[in-house]
């Protein structure tokens, strides 16, 4: 099991007594997954994985490490899912919409801006997989990932159409209506894989392999011109509108008030109360 420094203590405790070895990523002498596979596997081996859970860029590093050794991939099934019978379902938290008052730019304006970028690149299709990119582009927010206002989804765009892949139950009727008015079709979350197989064989496709999973990229036709470029949403998302800058200032005022109250409480109670990091965090 490979994990970073955040989980060294937890991993060691929870794996104690098992047959699983903890690999502390970044530590001296600890191989990367790619290095480990290259060292341990025999020529001609098959490497099994769930292509929906690893990025294409990650598998690119694996491919490079085993080059010339006649190895192949098997990624059609999630074997863990077959034995994890009580596995929790994917999150289905309701999505809400941000008004232009907060975003400073309408969904229609954002879609037009991204389509202009696609036109400059000569792209026929844009595949979006980064949840923050999709949330920003559509002015929608969710609660599917703890402490991140995003929702589980994929999205594709052409010059005159857009498809949002998600569980429709997380959208209310009003949001569905406004998305339809902006030319956005809704489809089931996992339909993207079969839809990508139907893409024109000569299409120019933009997809960020650093965020797109392996199966997304490899569902596209082999003959398609797949350009592994940074999502054209990333830079526009980073440029804050006037409304966003003003709202950031308001948020900083609220944050400053909370910190000021906390510092007052701390000075007043140091030496009087038994204050730990945990109790201080709860107070804050």
Can you say where each PLM-predicted feature lies in the sequence?
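A composition/biophysics-driven feature that prefers long, compositionally simple stretches
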Residues: 1-284
């Amino acid at each position: 099991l490979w994990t970073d420094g955040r989980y060294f203590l937890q991993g060691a405790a929870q794996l104690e007594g098992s047959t699983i070895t903890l690999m502390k990523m970044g530590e001296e002498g600890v191989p990367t997954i790619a290095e480990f596979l290259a060292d341990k596997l025999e020529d001609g081996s098959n490497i099994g994985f769930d292509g929906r859970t690893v990025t294409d860029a990650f598998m690119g590093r694996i491919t490079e490490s085993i080059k010339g050794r006649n190895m192949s991939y098997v990624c059609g099934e999630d074997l863990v899912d077959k034995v994890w019978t009580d596995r929790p379902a994917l999150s289905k938290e309701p999505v809400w919409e941000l008004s232009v008052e907060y975003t400073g730019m309408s969904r229609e304006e954002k879609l037009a801006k991204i389509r202009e970028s696609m036109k400059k690149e000569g792209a026929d299709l844009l595949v979006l997989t980064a949840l923050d990119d999709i949330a920003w582009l559509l002015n929608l927010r969710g609660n599917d990932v703890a402490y991140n206002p995003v929702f589980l989804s994929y999205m594709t765009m052409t010059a005159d159409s857009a498809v949002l892949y998600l569980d429709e139950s997380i959208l209310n009727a009003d949001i569905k209506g406004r998305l339809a008015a902006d030319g956005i079709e809704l489809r089931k979350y996992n339909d993207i894989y079969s839809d990508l197989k139907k893409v024109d064989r000569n299409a120019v496709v933009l997809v960020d392999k650093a965020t797109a999973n392996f199966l997304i990229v490899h569902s596209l036709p082999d003959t398609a011109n797949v350009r592994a470029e940074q999502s054209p949403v990333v830079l526009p998302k980073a440029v804050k509108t006037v409304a966003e800058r003003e709202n950031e200032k308001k948020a900083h005022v609220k944050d400053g008030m909370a910190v000021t109250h906390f510092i007052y409480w701390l000075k007043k109670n140091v030496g009087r109360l038994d204050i730990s990091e945990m109790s201080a965090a709860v107070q804050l």
